[in-house]
Amino acid sequence: MQLVIVTGLSGSGKSIVLKMLEDSGYYCIDNLPATLLPQASEHLSQGNHQRVAISIDTRSASLEALPGNIRKLKDEGIEVQVLFLEANVETLVKRYSETRRRHPLSSDTSTLAESISHERHMLEPLVDLGLRIDTSSLSANALRNWVKEFVTQKNGELILLFSSFGFKHGIPLDADYVFDVRCLPNPYYDPALRPQTGQDKPVCAFLEAHDSVQNMYDDIRGFIERWLPNFIADNRSYLTVAIGCTGGQHRSVYLAERLAAHFRRQEYRVLVRHRSLETN
């Protein structure tokens, strides 16, 4: 049985993800208490459900039981994948204001921002259970596409995720490492290159003509190659490397694509995401 556990902050998109998984043929359960996960998994596996998605959030009692229960399920041979969704405070406040919904931890004595902060603290032990996705600048469609690719990945070795972004949109919350490449020559100032991206050959040619770009690439690649074995030895499922330029269109995209291609050739499991391009 393949089991996808969806957790994270309220308002970060868990309902969107669960609906997408349901439309993709998963048997879905919303807001299952964490303590009931082993019993639910046993019952569902006996019922010949091959693909199951379960949402668990702060409304669930005994969240602290979740990490241990996930380890037990993996030991029993169940393929478990965990998605942790989050967003920055400004985005969550805006979403709640637009929908006029009440935060599950809200009270007469706390503000919405305080409720969000309290929930983030409660969920802190779950952050590193699987793949973190910062949905702050993601459209619903982009989130669906990210999750679709995630659930098609088989459990096993660490997955290396390269994510380009624009600093003007904010640093993504889900990054393990952030590299700032704004010091590199900027194709934006060439009118012919401005509407293109770091995936286009003219932009690649422009960047490859500068030694500083090659040096930056070599340094980032060398850093990852040096420390990646340590993350693998630590049994990490994912390592997210974020590369940022000003707008997330040219330099960061080029380097993310080039690094992803290099590590694929080394036979690592690699995903690549372009936050600003997918937002636009």
Swiss-Prot record:
The lineage of its organism: Bacteria, Pseudomonadati, Pseudomonadota, Betaproteobacteria, Nitrosomonadales. Pfam families: PapZ_C, RapZ-like_N. Keywords: ATP-binding, GTP-binding, Nucleotide-binding. It comes from Methylobacillus flagellatus (strain ATCC 51484 / DSM 6875 / VKM B-1610 / KT). HAMAP family: RapZ_like. Displays ATPase and GTPase activities. Belongs to the RapZ-like family. This is Nucleotide-binding protein Mfla_0145. ATP binds at residues 8-15. GTP binds at residues 57-60. GO terms for molecular function: ATP binding; GTP binding.
